[in-house]
Amino acid sequence: MLGASGVQIGTRFLVAEECDIPASYKERVIKASDIDAVVTGRSTGHPVRCLRNQLTRSLQKIEKEGGSEEEFNKLGVGALRRAAIEGDMQTGSVLAGQIAGMITKEQTTEEIIQELMLGVKEKLNLQVNGINA
């Protein structure tokens, strides 16, 4: 069977009831659209995917205009803390993957894992049925 050998699902678990981040962070992920996840930091060799906000627009402008790494880093210092601890959704680094636009509600970790396992079972059944056809 060909396909993925693993999954990376951090964004989904950010919105788990058990995740201890500010409600504003969870809300931002839930309200994200399919085009809100952007990458910054390519010019520094440290790309990061976050949800679009005032910080990402400023960082992207620096990169587009060929600003220095020092200028870039000055804006980024403490940005994750501002988002994940202080709940600042404008000048904080709201880390999230491309999947953010598909997350619509807060769930328990158990519910998330059950949904994932159901998806795996469905895919495996399709593979087995395809082989037996």
Where do the model's predicted regions map?
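Conserved active-site-proximal phosphate/metal-binding subdomains
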Residues: M1-A133
